[in-house]
Amino acid sequence: MISLKPLYDEIICLACFLTLFCGCDVYQPTKCRSYVGGYVQMNAIDIWQEKGMPSYLIVHLKEEPPVKTYHMCSTGKDAEIYTRLCTKHEDMTYNKVRSIGPAIEDSTPFFVDCDFTSIEVFADKDFNEEHPAGSNLGDIVRFMSWSPIKYIKSGYSELHIYNPEELSSAFYPIMREYFMENYFQRGALSTCYPIDKLICDTDSDDLVLLGHDAPGFLGALYFEMSPDDEKEFVITVTFNTDDGKSLSATTMMKF
């Protein structure tokens, strides 16, 4: 039996070439083998507290130039890395047509190039009696994010149906600050499923393809308890990756 894969790959590369070099306004209907159109190399995280928001931190990809990407139009070694990541996520049979523009990252979902095994959160001072300085706060900090991995592993057939009763009371007020309101309408369909768990209840299956089709936002860390006495802490957050890295960031947090 003759394999059509080389021909298929050539067609994809030709479509990408036309998209990238035929003009800034050109959008080409392109059959995408995978749901995830590209990955961004991740080497560091950034965390911060939004002004006037005392109870949570944002976790974000820290983009340190040059930003390295692997995507559906990559060639050579980068194309091999992209295919390996798609294979890892069982994302090889999407085969739907998208309109791909000059900036590929704006036309198709992108995610970071690693998944995570665990999250750790520490404070530099006693948080309360049960959480002295340096202890893990995973049992009082909730991780909130999105991921399309359930949609992908369903064979691209099972969309998430938004139901606010299935989520914590903190999910909507926080996440609506970063995502369009229509994501939060009752019954709204989405390829991305919400993640809404105490850190101590998460495992590696919950920490795959984090974000909502874009590689920057990784999630929010909501503190379900306020500290007993101190109101200002140095908080350190560590994301442990499935390729053996520990990515840490520190910020001052005021409650």
Give short role names for the model-derived ranges.
Residues 2-12:
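Bacterial N-terminal signal peptides that target proteins for export
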Residues 16-17:
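Intrinsically disordered, compositionally biased low-complexity segments in eukaryotic proteins
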Residues 25-255:
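Non-catalytic macromolecular-recognition regions in eukaryotic signaling proteins
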